[in-house]
Amino acid sequence: MQTYGDPNVSYAWYAANAGAVTNKSGRFISSHIAHTGLICFGAGANTLFELARYNPDLPMGSQGLVVLPHLAGLGLGGISNGVFTDTYQLLVVAILHLILSGVYGGGGMLHAFRYEEKLESYPATSRANKFKFDWNDPDRLTFILGHHLLFLAAGNIQFVEWARVHGIYDPVAGAVRQVEYNLDLGMIWNHQFDFLSISSLEDIMGGHAFLAFFMAAGGVFHILTKNYGEYNSFKGADLLSAEFVLSTSLAGAAYTAFVAALWCASNTTIYPVDLYGDVLQFKLGIAPYWIDTDSSLAADAHTGRAWLTNVHFFIGFFYLQGHFFHGLRALGFDFKSIGKLFDNLETSETTLN
């Protein structure tokens, strides 16, 4: 995993994925499935928690809810004018996520303890063998990247079709309605620069439809193509590693967290006022933060919008630090050398004195 010192370093049990997953393609699958199980469990458990304390007589935005407003935005729970009329649908969603978390957890354990550590252990003609990888094999890595892009495209298609067939919550109408996507490329291009002010559900769905096509095309491209020319250091030779992938993943997560924070703080189309509360006011103290503008809230109460915005921002900040840390390690920087530097300085001072 590390690109400095001994590349075959042994990790202790508490290093978790560093020792159990690094350079083991089969264990990568196990880790992915198990992490999906954790996400499903968190989603289901939080839905039940919020459902137990939801009060239909109070504005949803003032109750500090996070998961239920998202489900309402998807048109679930018989949402009307910001109030759920059929919470049984939400209960079904929560229980389904909890059941799936157990299934995913079992799948993670199955791949961890029953199946091979490395996919190259399977016959060369098997499907599993196609997804083996080596960090210095660009053709295999781009093949796997292509499949990731196809799954992302499928997620976008699912969302667009859900809005078109079932419908999503329209804050203007105060009801669920079917939304046809607006695939206007000029509109999509312009919204790169003013995405915080987007006010049309049709435009939002059009953006997702475009992303579905773009990612699907990218997925097919990466699956069918191979590295052109010499695979040199400029293209990532001897640089790509589990830690490098972790670094870039953290950068992507930080970027999306920052965008989500800015969007949630100010946009009322994707984050309706009757579901998340009023827009927030930006403040700058020791660190940037956002505060509620609703004077009717109790002194110690916060809207769901305030929770979402601030948590996303600070998580994004720490993800960014993780990106720099792991990125520098992937480039070969040994952070232990900093401690050695100070030790040498202390030794030099002692000698001079």
From Swiss-Prot:
It comes from the Bacteria. It is found in: Cellular thylakoid membrane. Its main location: membrane. The chain crosses the membrane at residues 28-48, 64-84, 90-110, 204-224, 244-264, 308-328. It is a multi-pass membrane protein. Its cofactor is divinyl chlorophyll a; divinyl chlorophyll b. GO terms for molecular function: chlorophyll binding. One of its GO terms (biological process) is photosynthetic electron transport chain. One of its GO terms (cellular component) is plasma membrane-derived thylakoid membrane. InterPro entries: PS_antenna-like, PS_II_antenna-like_sf. Induction: This transcript is moderately expressed at low and high light levels and is expressed somewhat more at 16 and 45 umol blue light/m2/s. The whole antenna complex is most highly expressed under low light; as the light levels increase antenna complex levels decrease. Thus at least in this strain the amount of antenna complex is controlled mostly at a post-transcriptional level. Transcription decreases upon iron starvation. The keyword Transmembrane helix applies. The antenna complex consists of divinyl chlorophylls (a and b) and divinyl chlorophyll a/b binding proteins and binds more divinyl chlorophyll b than does the antenna complex from high-light-adapted Prochlorococcus. Also forms complexes with PSI, consisting of a PSI trimer with surrounded by a PcbG ring (probably with 18 subunits). Is the only subunit found in this ring under iron-replete conditions. The antenna complex functions as a light receptor, it captures and delivers excitation energy to photosystems I. The Prochlorales pcb genes are not related to higher plant LHCs. This low-light-adapted strain contains 8 pcb genes. Belongs to the PsbB/PsbC family. IsiA/Pcb subfamily. This is Divinyl chlorophyll a/b light-harvesting protein PcbG.
